[in-house]
């Protein structure tokens, strides 16, 4: 950063890319190329970074992503144990079917760490890109949980209601996501021409909008199930001049 740092109360969200890859090849993933050259990735380096960020912003949020955080439970446990309880912790995962680690082991991990994990976000898309663990397994995750669904390119809009019913059965909230590689400051809040927003408003009850300059959320209800349509910029910093005349990295 070249300017003074400014962020929301509590500090910026810190994203931790776990130092091991996943077995997936989702077409909208922008992280896969980073794991092709992961020589500098290590649990030890991440532990040092966690300590640094805790000192700078002792109440910031941590988000584990990848890669696949649940591909190495021993390493994930070490990283979780290093985060003080002043922070909220989120995990993005496919909760995968994977060799060497059963669904029961992953469920037990969530039970042991239910006091450390704020929410687990499980990827389940309209189009299947990976071998998914059964919905009944997802429902057994011991922490608060949410399903993330990227509505990518020519997604099957006529399946949206069935998808909502699928998760209403377990009362698991749903977050539909725009392809964030296509999000810009100009279209972040642009509603005209937003096909996803139109498809959702056509099928579900629109409840309102919240957000900031970096991201937003359109909220919907379907028979008591809370759903969100989320858009976010593909980068974490914007440069802006404040009312005091000082230029900040935000």
PLM regions: where:
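Core AdoMet radical
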Residues: 13, 31-44, 57-72, 85-103, ...
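Alpha-helix termination/capping residues and helix-transition junctions
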Residues: 23, 55-56, 114, 168-169
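Flexible mid-to-C-terminal extensions adjoining Fe-S/redox cofactors in radical SAM and related proteins
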Residues: 32, 228-250
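A short, N-terminal amphipathic alpha-helix
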Residues: 48-56
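Distinct, well-ordered alpha-helical segments
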Residues: 74-81, 99-112, 131-137, 158-164
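Radical SAM enzyme [4Fe-4S]-AdoMet core and its adjacent flexible, acidic
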Residues: 125-236
């Amino acid at each position: 950063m070249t300017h003074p740092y400014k962020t929301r109360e509590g500090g910026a969200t810190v994203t931790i890319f776990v130092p091991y890859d996943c077995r997936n090849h989702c077409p909208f993933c922008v992280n896969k190329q980073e794991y092709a050259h992961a020589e500098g990735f290590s649990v030890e380096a991440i532990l040092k970074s966690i300590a640094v960020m805790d000192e700078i912003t002792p109440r910031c949020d941590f988000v584990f992503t990848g890669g696949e955080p649940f591909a190495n439970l021993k390493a994930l446990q070490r990283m979780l144990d290093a985060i003080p309880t002043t922070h909220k912790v989120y995990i993005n995962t496919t909760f995968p079917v994977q060799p060497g680690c059963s669904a029961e082991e992953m469920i037990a991990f969530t039970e042991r760490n239910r006091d450390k994990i704020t929410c687990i976000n499980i990827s389940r898309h309209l189009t299947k890109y990976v071998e998914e663990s059964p919905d009944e397994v997802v429902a057994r995750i011991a922490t608060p949980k949410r399903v993330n669904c990227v509505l990518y390119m020519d997604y099957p809009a006529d399946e949206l209601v069935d998808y909502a019913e699928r998760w209403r059965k377990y009362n698991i909230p749903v977050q539909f996501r725009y392809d964030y590689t296509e999000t810009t400051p100009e279209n972040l809040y642009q509603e005209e021409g937003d096909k996803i927003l139109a498809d959702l408003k056509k099928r579900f009850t629109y409840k309102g909008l919240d957000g900031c300059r970096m991201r937003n959320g359109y909220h919907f209800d379907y028979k008591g199930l809370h759903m969100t349509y989320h858009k976010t910029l593909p980068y974490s910093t914007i440069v802006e001049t404040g009312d005091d005349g000082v230029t900040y990295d935000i």
